[in-house]
Amino acid sequence: MRYSEMFLPTEREIPSDAEVVSHQLMLRAGMIRKLSAGIYSYLPLGYRVLRKVEQIIREEMNRAGAQEVYLPMVQPAELWQESGRWEHYGKELLRFRDRHDREYCLGPTHEEVITDLVRHEIKTYRQLPKNLYQIQTKFRDEIRPRFGVMRGREFGMKDAYSFDADEEGAEISYQKMFEAYKRIFARCGLRFRPVEADSGTIGGSFSHEFMVMADSGEDGLVFCATCSYAANLEKAEVHPPEKMEISNDEMLLLTEVHTPNARTIDEVCAFLNVTPQEIVKTLIFNADGNPVAVLVRGDEEVNEIKVKNYLKCQELELAMDDMIQDVTGAPRGFAGAIGIKKARILADYSLLNMKNVVMGANKEDYHLRNVNEGRDFQISAFADLKVARETDSCPRCQGALKFARGIEVGHVFKLGTKYSKAMGASYLDKNGKEQIMIMGCYGIGTGRTVAACIEQNHDENGIVWPMPISPYQVIITPVNMNDKALAETAERLYESLAGKGAEVLLDDRDERAGVKFKDADLIGIPIRVTVGPKKLAEGKVEVRLRDTGETSDVQVDSVEKMILRVIEGKMSESYLIF
């Protein structure tokens, strides 16, 4: 491709509304342009990268035995009503009516559509297993789209769905996709880590996220320094302390203390001269309309996802003031466990050995000292309900936990029968008995993968593309197109390399060399060949590698072999898994 013919509007200034590096560089490098909030057009350079990511995905999905389909983006409401998600999905689901007043939505995901397709076509165990995938546009009406294509409203996704006759087959399908995802992200040149994750609105029994390691990542991830345990922060478990018996002699006299206007942990600590570790926080939650009291140590935070999963409720939120008043008899800020009769009381493992702690008195402007579980109140159950911290131990081996930031680019779910049972996706087994299919689903954000790659591969000058997904492999830069010798040498190299299968961009613009070099660095092409008068007089050109900055002067008649060798080497580097 000739630069002069390409639609490639680069920018020098950093866009003021771009918060993260990938958004800034995708705009500056002429990869995308914003149409509306969370909705972007891909320009030729960006689309080349996107297509390369999609091609890697297709190759690995096909290799794993999946078959590509293409499903409608517009989905009828009745399918979502069958699955039960029409009521529960929330405002991210864009709903509308057609001219006949029939309700539809723009698909944020395709579990309902694929289940409907399969239930009508698969009737017997002989037709199983099946794994169907597509690369399609999705729409989620995010309340706050941000970070460019990282969190847009309209976005591309590869979603696959497996259907199996039994749990054993479903596990095999899950592992095939898990391994395929590792190959996909490795081939894209990403440093990544699979982590245990919550299944969220998709549902299912368990899932893994594939996290690209990046300091700018929205998601926290936790991993063990000793064993292979890894999870996102929402899912991360901690090893509970060993339960110790507390004798009656150790329990001090329960005392009520006047604490005017001391509502927060910091305020109570200052007023009573205690540490947060000596305080029990009592949070009242509304779980599907029912109050639940959750206790956690004062220096810890409640993990609402863990609470929701423990209770197996559909909706969980912090209680409003009227529910808190009804349950505790006091306003917000003075809740405690003693005397609560209208709510279950759950406690985090961090309180297993609590002794003589401070707690709200369920009375405005009062707290209690020397509270002891068992003597003063009863707990319904202890569970892992807090957000993991670096001081916690690995739930598998008790090793030290490490924390990092990451960007979720893929998610694999074992759905079980959540959708197949609700929508009647069944088959006849070997004995002619009707059985429900076991499902899995597997998603990759295609544009998100591109953005995550930039977050991980850039410097102060621009993008540093891994070879496998770079829009071009080589950029040839004659410093002066009006110099006949330089122009002819650049043309010959361009034609020769392109003829050997290399993807080459020839910068044939009538621009200063400095402008060309800045643009080459900005768009991140891995190999730059500079054709200049001094080197050419010696029969040489300069070859520069974008990732290392290494330069070498190479004879014109041998530069082609050298470049092809570098391309081959850098393509194979991508198979290293973090």
Curated annotation (Swiss-Prot):
Endpoints of the signal sequence: none
Domain writeup: Consists of three domains: the N-terminal catalytic domain, the editing domain and the C-terminal anticodon-binding domain.
Catalytic activity: tRNA(Pro) + L-proline + ATP = L-prolyl-tRNA(Pro) + AMP + diphosphate
Record protein name field: Proline--tRNA ligase
Superkingdom of source: Bacteria
Similarity comment: family membership: Belongs to the class-II aminoacyl-tRNA synthetase family. ProS type 1 subfamily.
Main location: cytoplasm
Function: Catalyzes the attachment of proline to tRNA(Pro) in a two-step reaction: proline is first activated by ATP to form Pro-AMP and then transferred to the acceptor end of tRNA(Pro). As ProRS can inadvertently accommodate and process non-cognate amino acids such as alanine and cysteine, to avoid such errors it has two additional distinct editing activities against alanine. One activity is designated as 'pretransfer' editing and involves the tRNA(Pro)-independent hydrolysis of activated Ala-AMP.
BP GO annotations: prolyl-tRNA aminoacylation
Protein location: Cytoplasm
GO cellular component: cytosol
Assembly with partners or alone: Homodimer.
Molecular function (Gene Ontology), one example: ATP binding
EC code(s) of this entry: 6.1.1.15
Keywords: Aminoacyl-tRNA synthetase, ATP-binding, Cytoplasm, Ligase, Nucleotide-binding, Protein biosynthesis
Species this chain originates from: Syntrophus aciditrophicus (strain SB)
Uppermost EC category: ligase
UniProt xrefs under InterPro entries: aa-tRNA-synt_IIb, aa-tRNA-synth_II, aa-tRNA-synth_II/BPL/LPL, Anticodon-bd, Anticodon-bd_dom_sf, Pro-tRNA-ligase_IIa, Pro-tRNA-synth_IIa_bac-type, Pro-tRNA-Synthase_IIa_type1
